[in-house]
């Protein structure tokens, strides 16, 4: 970023908390989490909650849960660049991901997860009886 003199286009924030987190998502056009190993990152879900389109690596744990995000291979920097470019230049695609992501996030509430878990336990117990 520094070599290309693009520092004004990116935010490398380090640790943020509280209102600073909300502000950063509010001013961001795209959230990118290119982690090679992230058991489960909550940050992409926070980005979706703030209507920011998300790009995550296929290798991340959140990729198993979040369907309405662009998923790229961590090592494929060309695909990552293409995804960023696409979201920045094709607003209808970015809007589609934010709208579908918001709908998806509503289904990821703890109440729904708990209900699914209860169903799994009930089915397991019924099979053992």
Protein language model features and the residues they cover:
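Nucleotide-activated donor-binding/catalytic signature segment of Leloir-type glycosyltransferases, i.e.
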Residues: 1-16
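Short alpha-helical donor nucleotide-sugar binding micro-motif in glycosyltransferases
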Residues: 15-16, 23-28
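Aromatic "clamp/platform" in nucleotide-sugar-dependent glycosyltransferases that forms part
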Residues: 36
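Short glycine/serine-rich donor-binding loops of glycosyltransferases
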Residues: 41-44
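Short hydrophobic beta-strand element within catalytic cores of glycosyltransferases
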Residues: 53-56
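Conserved acidic donor-binding segment of nucleotide-sugar-dependent glycosyltransferases
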Residues: 69-78, 86-91
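A charged, aromatic-enriched C-terminal amphipathic alpha-helix characteristic of glycosyltransferases
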Residues: 92-122
């Amino acid at each position: 970023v520094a070599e290309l003199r693009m520092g004004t286009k990116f935010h490398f924030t380090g640790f943020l908390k509280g209102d600073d987190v909300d502000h950063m998502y509010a001013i961001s056009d795209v959230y990118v989490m290119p982690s090679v190993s992230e058991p489960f990152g909550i940050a992409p879900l926070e980005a979706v909650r703030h209507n920011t389109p998300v790009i995550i690596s296929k290798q991340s744990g959140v990729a198993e849960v979040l369907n309405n995000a662009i998923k790229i291979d961590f090592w494929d920097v060309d695909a990552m660049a293409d995804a960023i470019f696409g979201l920045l230049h094709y607003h209808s695609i970015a809007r589609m991901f934010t709208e579908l992501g918001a709908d998806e996030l509503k289904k990821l509430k703890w109440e729904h997860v708990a209900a699914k878990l209860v169903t799994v336990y009930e089915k397991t117990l019924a099979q053992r009886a």
